């Protein structure tokens, strides 16, 4: 259902990370569907694991909507 992608976000690629080892300290921010800014995709996955949640990626970069020019 591609139409709903805007509402539900994109699945984070959590299988790409070894979450038991933790996440690299890189700043490549993603905004979760919980409207929280995560420093990188791995940290979003890590929080999902810790909290038993399924937060998805709402957008890459900050959570603020780009302001219209």
Swiss-Prot record:
Q: Which GO terms describe its cellular component?
A: extracellular region
Identify the domain of life.
Eukaryota
Q: Name one GO molecular function term.
A: serine-type endopeptidase inhibitor activity
Site: Reactive bond. Where?
A: 25-26
Which CDD domains is this protein grouped with?
KAZAL_PSTI
Please list the residue ranges annotated as the Kazal-like domain. 8-65
The disulfides recorded in the entry are 14-45, 23-42, 31-63
Q: Where in the cell is it found?
A: Secreted
In which broad location class does this protein mainly occur, judging by the first location in its UniProt entry?
Answer: secreted
Q: Which UniProt keywords apply?
A: Disulfide bond, Protease inhibitor, Secreted, Serine protease inhibitor
One family from Pfam that matches here is: Kazal_1
Keyword Disulfide bond attached:
yes
Summarize the protein's role.
Answer: This is a trypsin inhibitor, its physiological function is to prevent the trypsin-catalyzed premature activation of zymogens within the pancreas.
What protein does this entry describe? Pancreatic secretory trypsin inhibitor
